[in-house]
């Protein structure tokens, strides 16, 4: 069994150059706009980062390779799947483009090979990986929503769903309290990032500039919440 697992991992690692080459060809196609290329690369980056966060949590919980793959996959593509179904964008993105699945599998293999003892990692690594994936996916969600409709409000909601959906499924499967339900600022960072993104577009900035403004604003707010334990006032009913 051990040899078979190693063989499978090596096959995934060997497949990495092919997957990366396919992604590169998509991005340098002369007929593809710069904004589309940037969006695709950022989407792949967010997929990989969110997959890492799923692998690290699975490692801390001592899951088997199948459990690791499931947790990484739902984290990386869960939110986007919900978004596409809500927008009627079917078949969903990872069925139309299997590079997403390859990125997840390769990321799982590399993370399991390189990170031997997830329990000994610094406490902040998982939240920071989650924050990076969150920021990227909020931007992706807003952009994709605006392709299918014109409402800024719906775009922001789709951004929040894309960013938070996979993490919620991951935490529920792992029997953890979802990060979005904890006291620290989480969904609020997504909303503010979506507002920055849609406002920049309304002001006439390019899609790339608007996307990056939303991503970085979400990321900075979320990292600040992690560092200084920022939270919103709680609602509590007293007896």
Curated annotation (Swiss-Prot):
Name the UniProt key words of this record, in alphabetical order: Cell membrane, Membrane, Transmembrane, Transmembrane helix
- The superkingdom listed in its UniProt entry is Bacteria
Return the protein name. UPF0126 membrane protein VC_2382
Provide the taxonomic classification: Bacteria, Pseudomonadati, Pseudomonadota, Gammaproteobacteria, Vibrionales
Q: How does it sit in the membrane?
A: Multi-pass membrane protein
One GO location term (cellular component):
plasma membrane
Organism for this UniProt entry: Vibrio cholerae serotype O1 (strain ATCC 39315 / El Tor Inaba N16961)
Q: Which family does it belong to?
A: Belongs to the UPF0126 family.
Q: InterPro entries of this UniProt entry?
A: Gly_transporter (IPR005115)
**Which Pfam families did the record assign?**
Gly_transporter
Location(s), subcellular = Cell membrane
Q: Tell me where the transmembrane regions lie.
A: 38-58, 62-82, 86-106, 122-142, 153-173, 185-205
């Amino acid at each position: 069994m051990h040899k078979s697992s190693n063989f499978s991992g090596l096959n995934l690692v060997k497949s990495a150059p092919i997957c990366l080459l396919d992604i590169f060809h998509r991005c340098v196609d002369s007929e593809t706009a710069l904004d589309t290329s940037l969006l695709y690369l950022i989407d792949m980056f967010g997929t990989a980062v969110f997959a890492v966060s799923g692998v690290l949590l699975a490692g801390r919980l001592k899951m088997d390779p199948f459990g690791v793959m499931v947790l990484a996959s739902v984290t990386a593509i869960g939110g986007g799947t919900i978004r596409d179904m809500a927008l009627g964008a079917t078949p969903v993105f990872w069925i139309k483009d299997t590079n997403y699945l390859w990125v997840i599998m390769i990321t799982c293999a590399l993370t399991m090979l390189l990170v031997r003892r997830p329990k000994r990692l610094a406490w902040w690594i998982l939240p920071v990986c989650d924050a990076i994936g969150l920021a990227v996916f909020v931007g992706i969600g807003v952009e994709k929503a605006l392709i299918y409709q014109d409402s800024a409000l719906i775009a922001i909601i789709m951004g929040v769903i894309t960013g938070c959906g996979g993490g919620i499924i991951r935490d529920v499967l792992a029997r953890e309290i979802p990060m979005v339900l904890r006291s620290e600022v989480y969904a609020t960072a997504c909303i503010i990032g979506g507002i920055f993104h849609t406002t920049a577009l309304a002001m006439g900035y390019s899609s790339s500039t608007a996307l990056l403004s939303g991503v970085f604003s979400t990321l900075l707010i979320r990292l600040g919440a992690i560092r200084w334990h920022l939270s919103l006032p709680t609602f509590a009913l007293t007896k």
